[in-house]
């Protein structure tokens, strides 16, 4: 019985994945998207860490608020102003290659004293791949194991598919932002139409009542009736 238990423990230990104690690199930076409410007369900044020699694509869109516009700036980790836009509804900017450090993205609504803005933005990093690991994997495969299939062609096809899938996800996210902006516009227009329609109905009813009262006064005989 003890031998069976020891064998089971040994089997479980062999199945456990190896744990790296030291020398672990930083976790990969993930793409992200964020929607926030920018109050009137306020400026809000965000910081995003980026590795060196990568590609950072920034997309933003104002999906709610009067005017659908906002000021946008993008600064490098060294404080260099890379992008500066004023009163824009949307924008797409790419930084390539990136510097190691924190990039600063600022959205400014200080020009508006009344209307708050609903802003959507997305950060897309070019997924980095360790070239040494890829080369080591390719060298580990013997020529007779490739079955006459070129590894470079396979890697190129996979990379093309990955790029197209990432672009599809990006376009779907943008379409979702466009849909949210259009829905906000339609809801705002519906509220205005309902309000002014109610005002028109109230005015029509008031005019009708006044006309009836006026006509009744015209036909009233105020002369005394002889008895």
From Swiss-Prot:
Effect of residue 102 to N: In a breast cancer sample; somatic mutation
GO molecular function, one term: signaling receptor binding
GO cellular component: COPII-coated ER to Golgi transport vesicle; endoplasmic reticulum; endoplasmic reticulum membrane; endoplasmic reticulum-Golgi intermediate compartment; endoplasmic reticulum-Golgi intermediate compartment membrane; Golgi apparatus; plasma membrane
Residues on Cytoplasmic side: 216-227
Keywords: Cell membrane, Coiled coil, Endoplasmic reticulum, Golgi apparatus, Immunity, Innate immunity, Membrane, Protein transport, Signal, Transmembrane, Transmembrane helix, Transport
Motif annotated as COPI vesicle coat-binding, chain positions: 218-227
Superkingdom, taxonomy of origin: Eukaryota
Residues forming coiled coils: 145-170
Major subcellular site: membrane
GO BP terms: cell-cell signaling; endoplasmic reticulum to Golgi vesicle-mediated transport; Golgi organization; innate immune response; intracellular protein transport; signal transduction
Tissues where this protein is expressed: Widely expressed.
Secretion signal, residue range per the UniProt entry: 1-23
Compartments reported by the entry: Cell membrane; Endoplasmic reticulum membrane; Golgi apparatus, cis-Golgi network membrane; Endoplasmic reticulum-Golgi intermediate compartment membrane
Membrane topology recorded in Swiss-Prot or TrEMBL: Single-pass type I membrane protein
Cited InterPro entries: Emp24-like (IPR015720), GOLD_dom (IPR009038), GOLD_dom_sf (IPR036598)
SMART domains, per the entry: EMP24_GP25L (SM01190)
Positions on the Extracellular side per record topology: 24-194
Domain GOLD stretches: 43-125
Disulfide-bonded cysteines: none
Pfam families reported in the protein's UniProt record: EMP24_GP25L (PF01105)
Transmembrane regions: 195-215
Entry similarity comment: Belongs to the EMP24/GP25L family.
Note: Found only in very low concentrations in the endoplasmic reticulum, Golgi apparatus and endoplasmic reticulum-Golgi intermediate compartment compared to other members of the EMP24/GP25L family.
Protein name according to UniProt: Transmembrane emp24 domain-containing protein 1
Taxonomic source organism: Homo sapiens
Primary gene name: TMED1
């Amino acid at each position: 019985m003890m031998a069976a238990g020891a064998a089971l423990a040994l089997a479980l230990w062999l199945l456990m994945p190896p744990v790296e104690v030291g020398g672990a690199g930083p976790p990969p930076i993930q793409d992200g998207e964020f929607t926030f409410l920018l109050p009137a007369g306020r400026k809000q900044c965000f910081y995003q860490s980026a590795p060196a020699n990568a590609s950072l694509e920034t997309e933003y869109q104002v999906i709610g608020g009067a005017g659908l516009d906002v000021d946008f700036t993008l600064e490098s980790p060294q404080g260099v102003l890379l992008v500066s836009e004023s009163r824009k509804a949307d924008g797409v900017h790419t930084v390539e290659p990136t510097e190691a450090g924190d990039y600063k993205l600022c959205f400014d609504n200080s020009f508006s004293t009344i209307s708050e803005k609903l802003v959507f933005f997305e950060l897309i990093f070019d997924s980095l791949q360790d070239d040494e690991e890829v080369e080591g994997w390719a060298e580990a495969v013997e020529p007779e194991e490739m079955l006459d299939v070129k590894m470079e062609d396979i890697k190129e096809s996979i990379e093309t598919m990955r790029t197209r899938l990432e672009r599809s996800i990006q376009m779907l996210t943008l379409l979702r932002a466009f849909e949210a902006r259009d829905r906000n516009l339609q809801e705002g227009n519906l509220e205005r139409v309902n309000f002014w329609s109610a005002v028109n109905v109230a005015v029509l009813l008031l005019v009708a009542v006044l006309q009836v009262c006026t006509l009744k006064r015209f036909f009233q005989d105020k002369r005394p009736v002889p008895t």
